[in-house]
Amino acid sequence: DVDFNTWQHDNVRATHQPGSTFKLFVYATAMKQGWLPSDARLKDDYIQMNVVDENGKPSVWRPHNANGRFSGANIPLRAAFAQSINTIAVKLGQEVGIPNVIKTAQDMGIKSKLNDAPSLPLGASDVHLMELVGAYASVANYGEYVKPTMITRIVDREGKVVYEARKEVRTVLSDKEAFYMQTLLGAGMTDAGGTSQALASQNYIGQWFWNRRIDAGGKTGTSNSHADAWFVGVTPNLVGGAWVGGEYRQIHFRSGALGQGSKTALPIFGLFMKKVLSDASLAPKYLARYRIPEGVNPADLEGRFVYQSADTTRHDSSSVDLSEGIGEAPREEHGDNTPPPPAAAPHEPTAPKEPVNNTLNGTAEPVKDQSPKTGMNKNSATIKTDRTQSSGEKKPKKKTSGDDLFN
């Protein structure tokens, strides 16, 4: 047991680098600006940006993908999100505007300080688990953010209510925008290369998911130097998140594979959901499908591309030590992986002619395919997304089936 008088670290509310779980806010901002899951305007190629660190030292940032390669193809947003392709997330952040990404994240419940930096889409600013899960719950709630509540009310021995939590509800996405994000989260489970595919296995919720008894999705995240592993899972009536890591940034997993959200954090949510859905008293409440808002064109939800399956690159989400060589993947993991020169061979496109000037807070981290073993902290948070539970009024939902759009 830990003595609270000497150790008061709250792992649920302690801030950590969220890795690729932060991409939710980049893509949600894009949906708000009229982008669609099927949009393939952005190319997965070599990019570099002129940046300055917190001390004002100029440098060049070269974000990498997990496999150290670039496909050279225009990637649909659905595939880019499902496969957690970093180059697309960084470019999308520049397209929609980092200040707008920050505004979306704040509207969706992120109160931690977010830095206006090109690396923010990769999770450069620390957040805590509870606010992240609360933000993801607004996607399941069709765009309505409901502030997470630990204690809803207190009743004394006579049955008198002595305390009742104030309900905080606000609309942050339209029905259609939220549905697009539900689709992107689900693609991580169903599409080739999706980083959340394991959740759909029989080890977790596969028996219900593939029988179309529940819709589900999620996003993995892995931070700088494999210090933090994340997974946030979303279902229509229950959202949960797991973080695995150490109390201090100096504590990290022995390898990138051990620190991957898909290997270390996803199983926590998966086993939790399996227990819930296996319970005869709980299953009727949480076995649910999404409704399809009016005006959704099924073609707008498509956009598959077979590319990669890892969810992280060398410095996926944190402040970097410029002395380490920004954005260069370790040679022992991917061979000679120095960024390609401007005159690149086919499938290794050239760098942009005019690098973007901005402030640097991070890049990304490659991974090794190893089985996870860790003795680090494992923390999780869950939020019921049923509006009846949180706000006293249930948002009307049409009973349209999602069979043709999800599984």
Give the label of every model feature segment.
Residues 2-5, 31, 109-114:
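Proteins synthesized as precursors that undergo proteolytic processing into mature forms
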Residues 1-16, 20-24, 37-40, 99-105, ...:
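Periplasmic/cell-envelope proteins involved in peptidoglycan metabolism and beta-lactam response
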Residues 1-17, 22, 36, 79, ...:
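A penicillin-recognizing enzyme superfamily signal
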Residues 39-40, 45, 118-120, 149-152:
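Extracytoplasmic/periplasmic beta-strand context in beta-sandwich domains
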Residues 55-65, 96-134, 150:
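Mid-domain, small-residue-enriched loop/turn segments at the edges of structured enzyme/sensor domains
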Residues 36-101, 145, 157-186:
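Conserved catalytic neighborhood of penicillin-recognizing serine enzymes
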Residues 28:
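Extracellular glycan-interaction surfaces
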Residues 295-407:
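Low-complexity, Gly/Ser/Thr/Pro-rich intrinsically disordered linker/tail segments
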